[in-house]
């Protein structure tokens, strides 16, 4: 038995030895992982430089406003097209070209106009009639009618034909409608293309479809934005309710941990039960209604998600999912009922620790603020990088041309290239560039994403070390709370920044590398979806699974390494090794106690999110009679509901993360305490009387007195 024990400890390190001078987090410590600290500083300097360069070259207006063939904005104040908000395509049929999907523009001249055409005219018929004054507004600015028809159409100065159109997302699209199953534009089923040929309206449909693909997503985004503008204050109220519920729950947990845990468990079961009942009620209500028996597969994807709520199969799917969750939770509670009692004792001890360090409940606000800064800087830099390209002009021609697709200058184009491409046009193609900066844009975007992951993980690591240091000072105080420092949270925060910035940078760097690899794998997966190579797909799934597991393991290891850093002040690698071996020597306790506690915290989050989500659902669907006239009219009521649910989860997660870090810290300290001490007068346990009673441990000195 002794040999087995010696072999086990040799494989997972040796237990901590008794140190009479150890009284908790070490104050006399030195800087750790200085190289990583310097590396982080240089990376931040580079990141700021990238942001400045992006902000210098970028123009976010390119995301909002359409541009004509010259790259000039339509409807933008302060430009010559300020009174021309709509983009008009000379030949919408050419938008059916695959070039639209590759370079996101139609290979046809485009100009900004005050209004979309409301009548059918050809250039040939309008040129020598009184309709030409109307027609001329759809020609290029400054057009002079001093050329022949063929030259005008060749040079792309006027469209060959205009047809009745309607604006959509500031673009003019043919006003196509169906009459008795026949597609028509205006009152015609065919149209003349301006060259003496009549074409079917379906050609216009194909062109409009390709040009409209991106615009459908934009229209959906605009409708969602409209919903936010009329419901944002109600969303804020819902998030405030979630915050108050989280605070109330934690305050009650401080005094009534055992009762609250069981109440929480029952409430989650009841909430899921109500969800099952509601789904069944909707499923029964739709029985016999026209169209309610259509399957989800037959319906396909619809941008208006409310359509799915009129299908019985949707509510059946919801009911099955909720029923599975209900059964799984009940089974887990049955098999883990004894372990729940142990977890409750840990939560009570954590409640006492949080009670003595109450300012720790406000620390998630610091983390949230710093994360918002990281997200804002990353998002703005990303937008400016993506819009920092310059207008690139390409030579286009309807006939073969040796310079076709070459870059050109619209100011000098007719002089230099007219001999080789007599029918060519220098047309705006896309926003890009041929400078070193423009060629490096993809790399800068990757660097931007990588720095976001690194800084975000650093902020989270700083919070974990700070909380761990504060709660460790509580555990290692022999007389709680008399032996605790005056300001444990601020002391831990100062130690983390002063001594361990390098270690935090090291741990967050490792995690950021794994996360950026996962992002690249997701990108490659999207590119390979159309491929038929099954081996490549299988390999991609395996890689994604492996890196997902690796990220979870690194997060777990980092979390415990940060606790050891907060206590002992050792570097990252030493702390990670010691934490890992300590957990491996107590793997059963880790699996049972720590994970059961995490499960209980998850139930608490579900209770808060479920309660606020149900309240938001009834409010935004006008089902609360008292305030049904107060709820705003919406395009998609699920927009504010999902926002409230996600926001409530993040708020609850922020508050429960403090408790979770407290439990993890106390648990690790508890394992150290068991290895360092034996309860004798010389080596007394630091754990509280509750934990000693729970584990049948006593301090002999206390027993003798």
From Swiss-Prot:
Keyword set, alphabetical order: Antiport, Cell membrane, Glycoprotein, Membrane, Mitochondrion, Mitochondrion outer membrane, Phosphoprotein, Transmembrane, Transmembrane helix, Transport
Gene Ontology terms: biological process: choline transport; ethanolamine transport; transmembrane transport
Catalytic activity: choline(out) + n H(+)(in) = choline(in) + n H(+)(out); ethanolamine(out) + n H(+)(in) = ethanolamine(in) + n H(+)(out)
Ranges in the topological domain labelled Cytoplasmic: 1-33, 254-256, 337-364, 477-503, 584-598, 659-705
Transmembrane residue ranges: 34-54, 233-253, 257-277, 316-336, 365-385, 454-476, 504-524, 563-583, 599-619, 638-658
Entry comment on modification after translation: N-glycosylated.
Chain positions found as Phosphothreonine: 14
GO CC terms in record: membrane; mitochondrial outer membrane; mitochondrion; plasma membrane
Residue intervals on the Extracellular side: 55-232, 278-315, 386-453, 525-562, 620-637
Binding partners and assembly: Interacts with COCH.
Protein name: Choline transporter-like protein 2
Organism field: Rattus norvegicus
Gene: Slc44a2
């Amino acid at each position: 038995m002794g040999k087995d024990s010696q072999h086990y400890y040799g494989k997972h390190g040796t237990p901590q030895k008794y140190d009479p001078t150890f009284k908790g987090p070490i104050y006399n410590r030195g800087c750790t992982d200085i190289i990583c600290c310097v590396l982080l500083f240089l990376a931040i300097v580079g990141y700021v430089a990238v942001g400045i360069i992006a902000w210098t070259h970028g123009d976010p207006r390119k995301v909002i406003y359409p541009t004509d063939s010259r790259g000039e904005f339509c409807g933008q104040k302060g430009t010559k097209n300020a009174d021309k908000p709509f983009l008009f395509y000379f030949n919408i049929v050419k938008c059916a070209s695959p070039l639209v999907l590759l370079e996101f523009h139609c290979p046809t001249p485009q100009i900004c106009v005050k209004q979309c055409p409301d009548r059918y005219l050809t250039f040939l018929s309008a040129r020598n009639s009184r309709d030409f004054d109307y027609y001329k507004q759809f020609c290029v600015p400054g057009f002079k009618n001093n050329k022949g028809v063929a030259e005008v159409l060749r040079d792309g100065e006027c469209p060959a034909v205009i047809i009745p159109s309607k604006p959509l997302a500031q673009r003019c699209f043919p006003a196509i409608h169906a009459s008795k199953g026949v597609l028509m534009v205006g009152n015609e089923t065919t149209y003349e293309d301006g060259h003496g040929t009549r074409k079917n309206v379906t050609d216009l449909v194909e062109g409009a479809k390709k040009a409209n693909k991106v615009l459908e997503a934009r229209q959906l985004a605009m409708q969602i934005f409209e919903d936010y503008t009329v419901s944002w204050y109600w969303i804020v109220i819902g998030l405030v309710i979630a915050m108050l519920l989280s605070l109330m729950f934690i305050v009650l947990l401080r005094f009534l941990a055992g009762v609250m845990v069981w109440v929480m468990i029952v409430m989650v079961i009841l909430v899921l039960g109500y969800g099952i009942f509601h789904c069944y009620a909707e499923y029964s209500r739709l029985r016999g209604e026209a169209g309610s028996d259509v399957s989800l597969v037959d319906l396909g994807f619809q941008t208006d998600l409310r359509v799915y709520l009129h299908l019985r199969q949707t509510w059946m799917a919801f009911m099955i999912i909720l029923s599975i969750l209900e059964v799984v939770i009940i089974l887990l509670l049955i098999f883990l009922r004894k372990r729940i009692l142990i977890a409750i004792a840990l939560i009570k001890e954590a409640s006492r620790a949080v009670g003595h360090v109450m300012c720790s409940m406000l620390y998630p606000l610091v983390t949230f603020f710093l994360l918002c800064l990281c997200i804002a800087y990353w998002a703005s830099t990303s937008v400016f990088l993506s819009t920092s390209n310059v207008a690139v002009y390409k030579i286009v021609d309807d006939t073969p041309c040796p310079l076709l697709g070459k870059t050109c200058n619209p100011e000098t184009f007719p002089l230099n290239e007219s001999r080789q491409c007599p029918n060519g046009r220098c047309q705006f193609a896309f926003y890009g560039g041929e400078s070193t900066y423009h060629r490096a844009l993809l790399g800068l975007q990757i660097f931007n994403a990588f720095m976001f992951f690194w800084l975000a993980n650093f902020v989270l690591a700083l919070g974990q070390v700070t909380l761990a240091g504060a709660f460790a000072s509580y555990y290692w105080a022999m007389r709680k709370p008399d032996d605790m420092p005056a300001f444990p949270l601020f002391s831990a925060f100062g130690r983390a920044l002063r001594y361990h910035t390098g270690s935090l940078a090291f741990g967050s760097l490792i995690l950021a590398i794994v996360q950026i690899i996962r992002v690249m794998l997701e990108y490659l997966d999207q590119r390979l979806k159309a491929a038929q190579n099954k081996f490549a797909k299988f390999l991609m799934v395996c890689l994604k699974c492996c890196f997902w597991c690796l990220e979870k393991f690194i997060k777990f290891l980092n979390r415990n390494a940060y606790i050891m850093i907060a206590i002992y002040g050792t570097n990252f690698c030493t702390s990670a090794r010691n934490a890992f071996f300590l957990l491996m020597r107590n793997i059963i306790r880790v699996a049972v106690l720590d994970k059961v506690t995490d499960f209980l915290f998850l139930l608490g989050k579900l209770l808060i999110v479920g309660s606020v989500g149900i309240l938001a659902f009834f409010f935004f669907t006008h089902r609360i009679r008292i305030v049904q006239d107060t709820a705003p009219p919406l395009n998609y009521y699920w927009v504010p509901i999902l926002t409230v649910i996600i926001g409530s989860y993040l708020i609850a997660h922020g508050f429960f993360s403090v408790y979770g870090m407290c439990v993890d810290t106390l648990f690790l300290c508890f394992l150290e305490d068991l290895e360092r001490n034996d309860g004798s007068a010389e080596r007394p346990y630091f754990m509280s009387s509750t934990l000693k009673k729970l584990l049948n441990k006593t301090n002999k000195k206390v027993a003798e007195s």
